A protein has these predicted regions:
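Two-component signal transduction core modules
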Residues: 89, 138-139
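C-terminal output helix
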Residues: 50, 143-152
Length: 167
């Protein structure tokens, strides 16, 4: 049986009303080691929902199930990344007041062994900014579920295989 706890109980986020994933498996449960934790950041709940729905709970049959942690603020992203346990972060490049591209660059510069980061952008022409942001991959809105799941799976496979997340 899976033990459940709130995100706040895991010590990642203060209970300040941000919509995070309502519950996540407890660290002590054996199923946690098999799950992949994906942090999804956007100030807009509908963008977070679009990202999680496009990826689905299992982006590929050869990968473990995905457990999403949704956050709406930069402080929440920083707290989660500092706490560890995040296998992949997906950041909204259009988030306000701090966008995912600048946040990606900050995380890559400041965190040793930073987990892979995917940046979601609104315009295909903005993909070049991912190079500056040091993102490992880019998703373009509107999200195609096949492309989104494949991109996430490719990044996770590279990191699980001991290869750099960027191809």
């Amino acid at each position: 049986m899976l033990a459940w706890g709130t995100v706040a109980e895991r010590g990642w986020f203060p209970p300040d009303g941000h919509r995070c994933a309502d519950t996540v498996p407890s660290v002590s449960s054996p199923e946690v080691s098999a799950a992949t934790t994906v942090l999804v950041f956007s100030h807009r709940p509908e963008v977070r929902e679009a990202i999680t729905m496009a990826i689905g709970r299992r982006p590929a049959p050869d990968l473990p199930r995905v457990r999403f942690v949704e956050v709406g603020g930069v402080a929440d992203v920083l707290a989660a990344m500092d706490a560890g346990g995040v296998d992949l972060a997906i950041l909204d490049g259009e988030a306000q007041p701090t966008g995912g591209m600048g946040l990606s660059r900050q995380l890559k510069d400041e965190i040793t062994d930073c987990p892979p980061i995917i940046v979601a952008v609104r315009r295909r022409d903005d993909r070049w900014l991912a190079t500056w942001s040091q993102a490992d991959a880019v998703l373009v809105h509107p999200l195609d579920p096949l492309t989104a799941a494949e991109t996430v799976a490719d990044v996770l496979r590279r990191t699980r295989g001991g290869l750099p997340a960027r191809g």
